[in-house]
Curated annotation (Swiss-Prot):
Encoding gene per record: argG
Keyword list, A-Z: Amino-acid biosynthesis, Arginine biosynthesis, ATP-binding, Cytoplasm, Ligase, Nucleotide-binding
Superkingdom of the organism of origin: Bacteria
Molecular-function GO terms, alphabetical: argininosuccinate synthase activity; ATP binding
Residues the record lists as binding L-aspartate: 123, 127-128
List of residues binding L-citrulline: 91, 96, 127, 131, 182, 191, 267, 279
UniProt source species: Agrobacterium fabrum (strain C58 / ATCC 33970) (Agrobacterium tumefaciens (strain C58))
Enzyme class: ligase
A single BP term in Gene Ontology: argininosuccinate metabolic process
GO CC, alphabetical: cytoplasm
EC number of this enzyme: 6.3.4.5
Annotated catalysed reactions: L-citrulline + L-aspartate + ATP = 2-(N(omega)-L-arginino)succinate + AMP + diphosphate + H(+)
Cellular compartment(s): Cytoplasm
Protein name: Argininosuccinate synthase
Length: 407
């Protein structure tokens, strides 16, 4: 796609790393545009002040470095976990759910600064380009979007390094060769892809895992915690109320120490190819188990099964980048309605990579001791009623059987 030539000012999603620093300078030299940078603190665990200083060094006048951790967990992660969203049976969507938040801030900053375009550093092979751009267009249909990886003429890492040297962009010594794999991280998870991970038959090296210790190295004694919920959202750990971001960070610590949340998967990208990734979602893995457990005693069977039926579609919408679509918002309204009575506390045992639910309690529980007891239920349930229930449900099966036996 040809570069827009009428761009005067562009907001760049800027990490401060080599690639986005090269993109920054490329936007200045190729488009002659004024560049505004946006760096988000999503809980990736990196000091962000160097990104500000690097942007200043590259001549940027308008620099936005924002702590969005609470917004990320409260408005994006928690709504997603109310749905128990999992893509292709295993992926907890840690990268996918961060992209609409970044796009939202890019659009807001573009409006604030009078920019007519935004830019991102996603490659032309991945899902992130789609997620960034669908989200941006949903919020501003007239915004111009620049994706340098699809447009520039660099063919190799050497070309990038030569450009960096030509424009006096600092290059760390460990960046002069190919990185062994690429990493994306936020408060929910970290993902590692590419290079040493491209052969799906070969086990990932241990050094790839940065958020969790190996289950083999985890403590020999289990850790027991209690997670409290209110209207479907986790609100406390061991009775202590916490903000959304603090709660998730605390669960991450418990998960990391017990080797929880590792995932090696091959997923189907939206753009059509399969990719292998090594993901770590320690806190999210605990949160999902706890949320399903509290739902098990507070959700009606019909509501629970309907949620499970809809979940794959909801997860797919997030994975594909349709967070701001009307269908995702419609599903969210239904999901949020289901969470009105999802409150209580879940007890979990964490041990060597495993999350085991050992207890759940709620004032809104639908679990009845009187109904399920093996002892005298004092008339709460008349077992004779089951005969008619079974006969009615068997009617169509018996009718089919009679027809088939008479062939």
């Amino acid at each position: 796609m040809a570069l827009p030539k009428d761009v005067k000012k562009v907001v760049l999603a800027y990490s401060g790393g080599l690639d986005t620093s090269i993109i920054l300078k490329w936007l200045q030299t190729e488009l002659g545009a004024e560049v505004v940078t946006f760096t988000a603190d999503l809980g990736q665990g990196e000091e962000l002040e160097p990104a500000r200083k690097k942007a200043e060094m590259l001549g940027i006048k308008e620099i936005f470095v924002e702590d969005v951790r609470e917004e990320f967990v409260r408005d994006f992660v928690f709504p997603m976990f109310r749905a128990n969203a999992v893509y292709e049976g295993v992926y907890l969507l840690g990268t996918s759910i961060a992209r609409p938040l970044i796009s939202k801030h890019l659009i807001e900053i573009a409006k604030k600064t009078g920019a007519d375009a935004i830019a991102h550093g996603a490659t032309g092979k991945g899902n992130d380009q789609v997620r960034f751009e669908l989200s941006a267009y949903a919020l501003n249909p007239d915004i111009k979007i620049i994706a340098p990886w699809r447009d520039w003429t660099f063919k190799s890492r050497t070309d990038l390094l030569n450009f960096a040297e030509q424009h006096q962009i600092p290059v760390a010594k460990d960046k002069k060769g190919e990185a062994p794999f690429s990493v994306d991280a936020n408060l929910l998870h970290s993902s590692s892809e590419g290079k040493v991970l491209e052969d799906p038959a070969v086990e990932a090296p241990e050094y790839v895992h940065m958020r969790t210790i190996s289950p083999e190295a985890a403590p020999d004694k289990a850790t027991v915690i209690k997670v409290g919920f209110r209207k479907g959202d986790a609100c406390s750990i061991n009775g202590v109320e916490m903000s959304p971001a603090t709660l998730l960070a605390t669960l991450n610590n418990y998960g990391r120490e017990n080797g929880i949340g590792r995932l090696d998967l091959v997923e189907n990208r939206f753009v059509g190819m399969k990719s292998r990734g090594v993901y770590e979602t320690p806190g999210g893995t605990i949160l999902l188990a706890a949320h399903r457990a509290i739902e098990s005693i507070t959700l009606d069977r019909g509501a629970a099964h309907l949620k499970d039926d809809l979940m794959p579609r909801y997860a797919e919408l997030i994975y594909y980048g349709f967070w701001f679509s009307p269908e995702r918002e419609m599903l969210q309204a239904l999901i949020d309605k289901s969470q009105e009575h999802v409150e209580g506390e879940v007890t979990l045992k964490l041990y060597k990579g495993n999350v085991m639910v050992t207890g759940r309690e709620s004032e809104k529980s639908l679990y009845s001791d009187a109904l399920v007891t093996f002892e005298d239920d004092h008339g709460a349930y008349d077992q004779k009623d089951a005969a008619g229930f079974i006969k009615l449900n068997a009617l169509r099966l018996r009718t089919l059987a009679k027809r088939n036996l008479n062939k």
